[in-house]
Amino acid sequence: MITRSRCRRSLLWFLVFHGGATATGAPSGGKELSQTPTWAVAVVCTFLILISHLLEKGLQRLANWLWKKHKNSLLEALEKIKAELMILGFISLLLTFGEPYILKICVPRKAALSMLPCLSEDTVLFQKLAPSSLSRHLLAAGDTSINCKQGSEPLITLKGLHQLHILLFFLAIFHIVYSLITMMLSRLKIRGWKKWEQETLSNDYEFSIDHSRLRLTHETSFVREHTSFWTTTPFFFYVGCFFRQFFVSVERTDYLTLRHGFISAHLAPGRKFNFQRYIKRSLEDDFKLVVGISPVLWASFVIFLLFNVNGWRTLFWASIPPLLIILAVGTKLQAIMATMALEIVETHAVVQGMPLVQGSDRYFWFDCPQLLLHLIHFALFQNAFQITHFFWIWYSFGLKSCFHKDFNLVVSKLFLCLGALILCSYITLPLYALVTQMGSHMKKAVFDEQMAKALKKWHKDIKLKKGKARKLPSKTLGVSESFSLSSSSSATTLHRSKTTGHSSNIIYYKQEDEEDEMSDLEAGAEDAIDRIQQQEMQFHNS
């Protein structure tokens, strides 16, 4: 196993640095390797080997640290980053070894001069030259690999192939860096909710959720914040939700109300549960998707290259959809909270304790909360690509090249990308991590490997006790994307149940010794185990 892992890492860095070495610059007609001093070859090889070895050890130390800290989701995200780098290395190898064959592909001259991204003076001159003069002009420019017949041109030149090589490396590196910045800002936002979580240990919070305390529904803080005169009209409802995400994306009442609804639906009363830590783990679990580059995203990258034609202003127009997607997702998330508040008002005139929100997948587009994450992922990739393209143009052609004729438009595009980064990282993604907990199922981020083993062990013990002739009425146990533990008895279910307008009286105890405090994960596991034991006792009594 260790040998396979080392071989994989060695292959990864060979692919990456082999491609990086071939993509660092345009080739020249200098001496071959047989005419190069041996000391020069040895120095270059030593440099590449040392750098690759240091990076490999750095990633390995990071992986070991994540494993010791039980950051399994981030560890999987790191493995996905390695996989993306390996894909990049394979693309690099294909470009390198396929270079002689790609350069031999010729296309008609008319096709070669169509859909150009940059119409330079040389291109205008080429369009006026005769085919024979065009070939002589290209040969004089140093492109000696052209062997096309009269009236044809190479599909892509050697210099263009190396510039494309550099673009692919820029894309992979900037996407990873962009994703890391997004994750850091999101975690910073969620860290600010820790003070709200600590409030749940106070006596004031216990009083606020006391079911013996009657209040009018419209007087509760959550309902007041999300219902007003503008919520009665659909148009103003969404306009209000749109602007709300910029000023008060998540308030204290939002966090405490959604936390109360989540615990009432998925956990037993009286259990200690760190909801803020659970959201942080859930965000880390979603990061595995955000950091990857799917075939759909690669296809969007190719489509952009296809339509990046001179005069179409593709660079500017392509920077608008990511921002619109992020704004639409943020508006939808705010609308979900407002809808839950409206349903409380329509259903109950009086509530006991804290309002109990009823979460469901029906609040989300196509009953799929995961769709919002895919939209965020697409917007982040497109935004990262816009920034990548800007720096690639600057590196390869210069800041004031023909790609940046309208420099004011370029600056506007960069501000849009920066605004989308801040909006998505600090507002939309944390809001998504909170609101999607109101779906129909609990995410697996609440469980770690130790808990999964404990649950499976209990499952196995119960099956052994029952024997082949006896079987529980209904048991579904395991760790998956949505954890479910159901029974024929309505009293022993982890699924969301209908409310009558009052909430459970959840009591929290402060522990004097922090070391003896049961973690939220252990509490969730013990809760599931208790329910299994109850099922077993009910079965024996019957």
From Swiss-Prot:
Bilayer-crossing regions: 39-59, 83-103, 166-186, 289-309, 316-336, 375-395, 415-435
Source lineage: Eukaryota, Viridiplantae, Streptophyta, Embryophyta, Tracheophyta
Knockout-associated phenotype: Impaired pollen tube reception in the female gametophyte synergids; the pollen tube fails to arrest and continues to grow inside the female gametophyte.
Cellular component aspect of the GO annotation: cytoplasm; endomembrane system; plasma membrane
Localization, UniProt: Cell membrane; Endomembrane system
Topological domains, Extracellular: 1-38, 104-165, 310-315, 396-414
Bilayer disposition of the protein: Multi-pass membrane protein
Keyword Cell membrane included in the entry's annotation: yes
Entry's family note: Belongs to the MLO family.
MF (Gene Ontology): calmodulin binding
Protein name: MLO-like protein 7
Highest taxon, organism lineage: Eukaryota
Tissue: Restricted to pollen, synergids, pistils and immature anthers. Also detected in seedlings, leaves, stems and inflorescens.
One Pfam entry name: Mlo
GO biological process: one example: defense response
Keywords for this protein: Calmodulin-binding, Cell membrane, Membrane, Pathogenesis-related protein, Plant defense, Transmembrane, Transmembrane helix
Organism: Arabidopsis thaliana
InterPro entries cross-referenced by the UniProt entry: Mlo (IPR004326)
Comment block on domains: The C-terminus contains a calmodulin-binding domain, which binds calmodulin in a calcium-dependent fashion.
Stretches for region Calmodulin-binding: 449-470
Residues in compartment: Cytoplasmic: 60-82, 187-288, 337-374, 436-542
Role description: May be involved in modulation of pathogen defense and leaf cell death. Activity seems to be regulated by Ca(2+)-dependent calmodulin binding and seems not to require heterotrimeric G proteins. Controls pollen tube reception in the female gametophyte synergids.
